[in-house]
Amino acid sequence: MPLSDIANVSISLQTGGLTQQGFGTGLILGYSMTGWTERSRTYSSITGVAADFATTTPEYKAANAYFSQTPRPEQLVIGRGTLKPTMIFKLTVASVNNSQKYSVVLAGTQFDVTSDGTATNDEIIVLLQAAVAAAATTAGFTAAIGGVAPNTFLTLTGNAVGNWMSFYPTDPALLTLQQTTANPGIATDLDAIVVENNDWYALMTLYNSSACVLAAAAWAESKDKIYGVQVIDSECATVAAGIATDISKALQTAAYFRTWDTYHPDNGQFIDAATFGRLLPYIPGSETWRGKTLAGISAMGTVPPFKMTETWRQNLIAKNAGYYYTNAGRNITAEGKVAAGEWIDTIRGRDRLKARIQEAVALVVMNSDKVPYTDAGIGKLDNAIRGCLRLSVGDGFLTDAYTVVVPTAASQALVDKAARILRGYSFTAP
């Protein structure tokens, strides 16, 4: 029986059943495991992950980013997805320039081509396809030219479901990247995983196209989870919020309160996993998610390969998306908001407080022969709830200026008394 059957708690946000350890635990939805019959495994270090995954797999790379932070998280869950995606990248020319160098990085190797003195879109695409074709094949992908002249584009498609590689242009002002991977059934896999193991809090995915991200975000929104995702589509940064149709804008438009997206052009960085690894060890609500340095993550700056202009930065801010950049000589995370605009530490603190109140009220009910429907009985519940509020003040999530409204037994409707339901108890925290 869930605790919500005993204590149904609703905490609303007035601005803009996990264990304590579970609130500090992330889950990576993976596909590279072999020989598993279970839907998840829990790890306490990268050594354990290395026993199950090759160092070339995205699961290992994401886990390594997660466990490399200080303070280090205590544990990580990797969930087994059975509905594997086919990874697809689409690369288009954003600016056709004569005698211009165009560069992409595939599986860690940079490939450069230079247009001639009478450059065309199609010429640049042909040069890029020829440059990366062999390396793409080695990585398990096919580099092909799509579209119709004079507006062709380059696609890189996994030769088998579950194939993964890193790929990005060094300058989104010249080349625009988009992941177009179809959603293979992310919600179905996650539903199966939580049946076996629901004691985790922060979801991470490895194939982050718009379709996959929106599916994962919708799933997390309906659960007591948060979803952190690194978005790499160039238009998240390069297109203004007012006219954008990219992933970050779609998440913002959907007003997701449980999804935090951060932009970095290189999907091999795993900035989402690194950020979760850095901040999940803190008591929920006691931390801020901006201004933090991440171990092993390359920051964006004014020049390639991880270029960030002030205009692009403002575009991301307008979409409530995060980013990782160099500021005053220090590499730090920026913004720390969920897609709907609330601070992610507020969401996390609220979730923990809700869970603790449910536990506290349930314990009063379960440890008492009977909680009488009198003012004295209501007082027992009030004392338990106030204890949770005081803990949240000590954690730094709430201020001590909160107010509590405690209903009297006489104010309750007879039908609620008969059903043993208490209505009207509430608290407000500035």
What is the predicted function of each stretch?
Residues 65-83, 161-294:
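Extracellular Cys-Trp
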